[in-house]
UniProtKB/Swiss-Prot annotation:
Residues 1343-1368 are annotated as: Disordered. Belongs to the Mediator complex subunit 23 family. Residues 1347-1368 have a biased composition (Polar residues). The lineage of its organism: Eukaryota, Metazoa, Chordata, Craniata, Vertebrata. Interacts with ELK1. Component of the Mediator complex, which is composed of MED1, MED4, MED6, MED7, MED8, MED9, MED10, MED11, MED12, MED13, MED13L, MED14, MED15, MED16, MED17, MED18, MED19, MED20, MED21, MED22, MED23, MED24, MED25, MED26, MED27, MED29, MED30, MED31, CCNC, CDK8 and CDC2L6/CDK11. The MED12, MED13, CCNC and CDK8 subunits form a distinct module termed the CDK8 module. Mediator containing the CDK8 module is less active than Mediator lacking this module in supporting transcriptional activation. The keyword Nucleotide-binding does not apply. One of its GO terms (biological process) is regulation of DNA-templated transcription. The gene is MED23. Required for transcriptional activation subsequent to the assembly of the pre-initiation complex. Component of the Mediator complex, a coactivator involved in the regulated transcription of nearly all RNA polymerase II-dependent genes. Mediator functions as a bridge to convey information from gene-specific regulatory proteins to the basal RNA polymerase II transcription machinery. This is Mediator of RNA polymerase II transcription subunit 23. GO terms for cellular component: core mediator complex; mediator complex; nucleoplasm; nucleus; transcription regulator complex.
Length: 1368
């Protein structure tokens, strides 16, 4: 091949050589030149035609090498003309020629003439290269240019500029050689943010990159760097807050020139989240940290160090370190965060201590030094035994800096809890010294002079063998010697003995034959707070081991109340999670269950129901699954344990947070049976109600009409196979649409009331006619016999006023588990009986019998009966009768009302502050004993039956507390049925005080007002009543201003029904301001301080958000009005809203409005429509500047040139950034149905792109279907605008954005729909967008499309970017 090529080209070159040798003598005319070219090409064409496809590239490379081997510019020029003609006549493929020329090793800038001629040729033929080829050439040319040094002779610059001209041609927008988006991507790869382009390119490249700033802006959320989440709020777990763990930058899509602040590390965001209590899961989520992979994260380390420095600064200004003060809460939280992140090796302890030393050096901050040492002591004492001494020595360096005293530091007052902090440094020294001794290290660290008195005091205290509990000496000794077993036994032994009891004394517990060890006073919280994590771990380990030992021994003596209460308190500490709650759920519970220690099991479930706070949802769902397993075991089929298991399960189900339901239940999709009850219809109904509420509050089903393809489907189908049931139409109408559709399709035939009555009569006849006692007992308690026995007991009481002993025996034989079915039928039977009763005397008789069955005979507990009644699916009149029975049961006799009022009056919900709970608990049970084994009936029958059932220990529960989750359900049922509103008000008046003991009163109110928004719209009085009853029940246990605003309490609570209070703008501004100040960490904050460990909410912002939403939903104003008023806080000029942090206000509005029901936030769509229809976007003369300035909120705001469109844009972004994917899924419909018909101008189109562009990434990750619909809508709008305009001025930014959308998000998923639209556009647009469609008639030349190489911005194959299956 080479020989043939040589003969063809050398023939032509020969004549050139002669001409060069005798210049002037031989001169070719242009015609001769042409002839030579044609003959050379003719010979080459023949040769090329015989070549195989595989040899083409090799052939062209040889020709280039041959040309570059020539030294005469004229010869090179002639040969290049040959190549150009070969390309122009279609003989050679232009892409291959250009690539071979530029990739040639001999093309060097020093050969300036060759360089200039080569790039001239490339410039001539590059127009025929396909767009991907042009992209690859651009990359190679840019890299070639980089080989030119910074200084060259000015004589050669002109020649070198030929390369720049090729680049200029490639970047020329009107030439459209490739999507400009490809070009900017290649440029930004070589010249990222902050790197200057090569001098040869000058401003050519930077100007071109600048043309992409509008595209970058279209893809950016306005003020994104100022937006902050509420930790533990539903939105906080979504992708919006993710950061790069190495740089802390936002993960931005595409290599666009985004605004500078988006490229900065987002330290403020991470720092804000870290400052929030209970934020560690969110931090891991944001940074993609996984506990299983121990990876150090230096940026996180830096922020933790900065937080400690901030706490040191705060301590410097605080007068005193008071109990529950801001500074104490901050140090407490810091210690918890530090232990977690260092324990899982996301942060390195020695690095952090050295960094702290560096940042505190020379600052003179020493007021907080004891607290800092306390935080470090927590980690040191817990991990020094497992790590090298060298890791902890930097602490001594910190000591030298912070403790400059030359004299002794005096011993603090050990009656105060702060004394443990003052001793922290001495404790650290003791641990370091102990480690050095154990390691036989040469490094003996002498006791620092200033700490000598502290050390002597500890040594002396250790010699005192009888330690008292009245000061903090025991805590000090535990903290100092927790790594020294000889010394540690004494103080830890003293603690343990206090709560275990001395082994001899016994005290009674509620119920018959139930005794416990005699210690009743738990360890107080401030003592537990004063123990290091290491000491607390030893204590909790000791307790858990003792409980397991007692479980194995099947001890008949119950655990001491002090031990149970202390154990509950220890479980609040997140720092000891592995031995705490994790051990409780994964080890202790299963072990106790295996040992059949039912008393201890009952105790653990009671602890979980009444004493635990902030337990992570996966532990709660794990417990629920344990409970369903438990319920199926024969041994748990006894009244008290069965009741406890069901009550605990009910609490777990109803207390699930709306944003927790989906993530938790999707973990069980492969086997939904584990989290569902195989036999309890009530528990499964409770789960469906929770599902309905959760999907409503998170807007999960918004925009969908079926549960097909969603995670709910398997759960619902499994429930229907376990416990088939129906829902009353008034309950069903509140369900989200897809759930309604499911239950309408899966309708279950109900037994008619008439049949039920007939069956009862039939069984009653049998009862009366049978005479053999054993036959009667067998018949009525047999498995599979109809569950009508309670109906029979009712009939007996109605007719004979008593029940005989056989009745009692049958009940006993039926067993707790089977009896539930009898209660269910009885509930239906009661409704039938009451519906047909004649009223008057007969009705009173019915009520009396019913109450006797509960209170006199103890046949069924009130909470179970009410739960069954509330969960039946009666319609119309019968539903009203059912609720009438509930009301009678709760209010008619005094039994329950007295129990409630006494319990509320004598007890406080703040159990962590009490040391006498047990005494009050026992007094209450003496006055109102719980009877769970039909005792009343046993006493009444003739002859009376002696009951032998020993009670399982009851430490916390009673009928009032058990009734609370049932009351939650009752209120909801009453809300659904309009005619029973008055009865609900009466119930709230008499029993509302119980909400004082609800563990989530505000959340319950929030969920209720949110879920029933439609039902409560026109019932302002009832809403107010509900809020007043629940919030009012807490008035004695909460400081003023903890929840509702003063204005609301003054104006709304006292407003009359006919004249409701309508708030003004000032009210809304103050309400939003309250959340803004809370999130900014203002001190003192808008809400009183509290111990977040025992609060309903995990941090101040979550509390502020929920109470604000409750207050807004409780207003007697429509959702639309409230929504508009909230938007007006920033869209209207408000004197109360400071200009300088307007984005913080937008952030707060975004958080609040997205946490409210749809009517509140949907008003934003109306605002967007009015902006899009406003003259500044519809008329070309209204705004003559650059539209991107008009939409730039930051620039408009800073230059005081406020425009309503930029404000609305920024606010819409804040709202949508906080929205759930369900809320966002209304955007496609909004685009196609509302905006598409009105978008006619270029400004309007660009505004819509600005609005929705930044959210394509979330749609791609979370709901692909919506992303595809939006993609198509964007093209439809473009077609509209193109048809309505004579000329588009901003065609390039529009096309750049559409290319970005294709390569970053939609891929080819919208190709079919889009091709049709592009074919109808005007030529200039069609030319620019032709690469999106791949339609051959739009391609520049019939060039075979080449395979795309790896430098591409995104795949171009026929697939959607597959980050999510197209599920919805």
């Amino acid at each position: 091949m080479e020989t043939q090529l040589q003969s063809i080209f050398e023939e032509v070159v020969k004549t050139e050589v002669i001409e060069e040798a005798f210049p002037g003598m031989f001169m070719d005319t242009p015609e001769d030149e042409k002839t030579k070219l044609i003959s050379c090409l003719g010979a080459f064409r023949q040769f090329w035609g015989g070549l195989s496809q595989e040899s083409h590239e090799q052939c062209i490379q040889w020709i280039v090498k041959f040309i570059h081997g020539q030294h005469s510019p004229k010869r090179i020029s002639f040969l290049y003309d040959c190549l150009a003609m070969a390309v122009e006549t279609g003989l050679l493929p232009p892409r291959l020629v250009c690539e071979s020329l530029i990739n040639s090793d001999t093309l060097e800038w020093e050969r300036t003439q060759l360089w200039a001629l080569t790039f001239k040729l490339v410039r001539k033929i590059i127009g025929g290269v396909d767009y991907k080829g042009v992209r690859d050439l651009l990359k190679v040319i840019l890299e070639k240019i980089l080989t030119i040094p910074n200084t060259v002779s000015s004589a050669v610059v002109q020649q070198l500029l030929a390369a720049r001209e090729v680049i200029a041609y490639i970047l020329e927008r009107n030439a459209c050689l490739l999507p400009a988006y490809f070009a900017v991507t290649e440029i930004r790869k070589l010249y990222p943010e902050g790197k200057l382009p090569h001098w040869l390119l000058g401003n050519l490249v930077s100007d071109f990159v600048d043309t992409f700033r509008p595209t970058a802006r279209i893809n950016s959320i306005c003020g994104r760097c100022s937006l902050l989440p509420v930790v533990n709020n539903s939105g906080a777990i979504c992708n919006s807050w993710k950061l790069d763990p190495a740089t802390l930058r936002f993960p931005l899509k595409g290599l666009l020139p985004y605004d500078k602040d988006l490229f900065e590390p987002q330290t403020a965001l991470l720092r804000y989240v870290l400052e929030q209590p209970y934020s560690r899961d969110m931090v891991c989520n944001m940074l993609g940290l996984n506990k299983q992979h121990k990876q150090r994260c230096p940026v996180l380390e830096d922020q933790l160090v900065d937080l400690v420095v901030y706490a040191m600064e705060r301590s410097e200004t605080e007068e005193k370190f008071d109990d529950g003060g801001t500074s104490q809460l901050l140090w407490q939280h810091l210690s918890s965060q530090l232990i977690f992140f260092v324990l899982f090796q996301f942060a390195s302890f020695p690095h952090m201590v050295l960094s702290l030393h560096q940042k505190l050096a020379g600052r003179g901050l020493i007021k907080g030094r004891d607290h800092l040492m306390w935080v470090l002591l927590q980690f040191i004492s817990g991990s020094i035994q497992k790590n090298a001494l060298a890791d902890f020595l930097p602490v001594m360096k910190l000591f030298d800096l912070l403790y400059p005293e030359k004299e002794y530091i005096p011993v603090p007052d050990i009656n105060k809890p702060q004394s443990t902090h003052a001793f922290a440094m001495t404790c650290i020294w003791i641990h370091l010294n102990r480690k050095a001794q154990n390691d036989n290290s040469k490094l003996q660290i002498p006791i620092p002079h200033s700490l000598r008195l502290h050390h002597e005091f500890l040594q002396q205290s250790l010699r005192n063998k009888s330690l008292q509990m009245n000061d903090y000496k025991i805590a000090l000794l535990c903290n100092a010697y927790s790594t020294n077993s000889e010394c540690f036994t004494l103080p830890m032994g003293a603690l343990v003995e206090t709560i275990y009891g001395n082994g001899i004394m016994r005290i009674p517990l509620p119920g018959t034959n139930c005794m416990a060890s005699g210690s009743i006073t738990p360890l107080p919280m401030n003592l537990l707070d004063s123990l290091t994590v290491h000491a607390k771990m030893s204590l909790i380990h000791s307790i858990a081991t003792r409980v397991i030992k007692l479980a194995h021994a099947k001890s008949s003596v119950a655990l001491a109340p002090a031990l149970v209460e202390t154990y509950s308190r220890l479980l609040v500490y997140m720092e000891i999670e592995s031995l705490g709650i994790k051990g409780f759920i994964s080890q202790l519970l299963p072990t106790v269950f295996k040992s059949h220690a039912w008393g201890i099991l009952h105790t653990l479930l009671e602890m979980f129901s009444y004493r635990m706070h902030h337990i992570q949802p996966h532990y709660r769902v794990q417990l629920l699954s344990h409970l369903h397993t438990l319920a199926a075991v024969a041994q748990t089929n006894q009244n008290q344990l069965h009741l406890c298991v069901e009550s605990t399960a009910l609490r777990l189900i109803t207390a699930l947070g709306s944003s927790e339901v989906q993530p938790q239940f999707t973990r069980f999709l492969s086997d939904p049976k584990t989290v569902l009850s195989a036999e309890s219809e009530e528990l499964n109904r409770a789960l469906i109600l929770t599902l309905a509420r959760a999907t409503h509050v998170t807007d999960f089903f918004t925009g969908s009409d079926s549960i097909q393809g969603t995670w709910c489907k398997d759960i619902l189908q499994t429930i229907m196979s376990f416990t088939p049931h129906n829902w009353a139409s008034h309950t069903l109408s509140c369900f989200p649409g897809p759930l309604q559709a499911f239950f309408k399709q899966n309708n279950v035939p109900q037994e008619s009331r008439f049949n039920l009555k007939k069956n009862v009569e039939e069984e009653y006849r049998k009862w009366k006619s049978m005479s053999n006692e054993n036959d009667i007992i067998t018949h009525f308690s047999m498995q599979g016999s109809p569950p009508l026995f309670l109906c029979l007991l009712w009939k007996m009481l109605l007719e004979t006023d008593h029940i005989n002993q056989i009745g009692y025996r049958v009940l006993e034989r039926i067993g707790a588990r089977a009896l539930v079915a009898h209660v269910r039928t009885f509930a239906d039977f009661l409704v039938y009986e009451f519906s047909t009763s004649a009223g008057g005397q007969q009705l009173n008789k019915c009520i009396e019998i019913l109450n006797d069955m509960v209170w006199k005979y103890n046949i069924v507990t009130l909470d179970r009966l009410i739960l069954c009644l509330a969960m039946r699916s009666h319609e119309g009149n019968e539903a009203q009768v059912c609720y009438f029975i509930i009301q009678l049961l709760l209010l008619k006799p005094n039994d329950f009302r007295n129990r409630v009022s006494d319990f509320v009056k004598e007890n406080s919900p703040e159990h962590w502050l009490q040391n006498d709970w047990h005494t009050k608990h026992m007094n209450y049970h003496k006055k109102y004993p719980e009877k769970l084994y039909f005792e009343g009936l046993a006493e009444q029958v003739d002859p009376p039956v002696q009951i032998q059932s020993p009670y399982l220990p009851i430490y916390f529960g009673n009928v009032c507390l058990r009734f609370l989750p049932v009351f939650d359900i009752v209120i909801h049922r009453f809300l659904e049925l309009l005619p029973v509103s008055k009865s609900l008000e009466t119930l709230l008046d008499h029993l509302g005080g119980l909400y004082k003991f609800h563990d989530r009163p505000v959340t319950y109110l929030y969920n209720t007002l949110h879920y029933y928004e439609m039902h409560l719209r026109d019932r302002a009085f009832l809403k107010r009543k509900l809020v007043h009853a629940i919030i009012g029940s807490l008035k004695d246990n909460r400081p003023q201003g903890w929840c509702l605003s003063d204005t609301y309490l003054k104006c709304a609570m006292n407003a009359r029904e006919e004249n409701p209070w309508v708030p003004d703008d000032t009210y809304y501004c103050r309400l939003i301001g309250r959340l803004v100040d809370t999130m900014a960490g203002k001190s003192p904050g808008p809400f009183p301080n509290c111990d977040w460990r025992f609060n309903e909410f995990p941090n101040p912002a979550a509390h502020a958000l929920h109470v604000t939403c409750v207050e807004l939903m409780a207003l007697a104003v429509s959702g639309k009005e409230v929504g508009n008023a909230l938007l007006n806080v920033v869209l209207k000029s408000q004197p109360l809203v400071p200009r300088e942090n307007i984005t913080a206000w937008m952030n707060a509005i975004g958080l609040i409005i997205t946490a409210l029901p749809e009517p509140y936030w949907i008003v934003l769509h109306d605002r967007i429509v009015s902006v899009i229809s406003s003259p500044s976007l519809t008329s070309e003369t209204e705004w003559v500047g650059y539209p991107f300035r008009l939409f730039d909120f930051t620039a408009c705001h800073q230059s005081y040139s406020e425009m309503s469109c930029s404000y609305t844009l920024a606010l819409a972004h804040a709202v949508w950034h906080h929205s759930s994917i369900g809320q966002l899924s209304l955007i496609p419909k909004f685009l196609t149905e509302v905006l598409l018909p009105i978008v006619k101008t270029e400004f309007q189109l660009l505004y819509v792109y600005h609005l929705v562009g930044p959210f394509l990434q979330r749609f791609q990750q979370e709901r692909t279907r919506c992303m595809i619909e939006i993609g198509v809508a964007f093209y439809d709008m473009l077609l509209n605008v193109d048809q309505c305009s004579t000329h588009l001025n901003y065609m390039d930014p529009i096309c750049d954005f559409l290319y970005h959308m294709k390569y970053m998000f939609t891929g080819d998923s919208v190709k079919e729909q889009v091709e049709k639209i592009i074919c109808n556009l005007k030529p200039a647009l069609k030319l620019r967008l032709r690469f999106i469609t791949h339609i051959s008639k739009m391609e520049p030349a019939a060039v075979p499309p080449q395979a795309m190489n790896s430098g591409s911005p995104a795949p171009q194959s026929n697939q959607v970017p597959v980050s999510l299956p197209v599920t919805q």
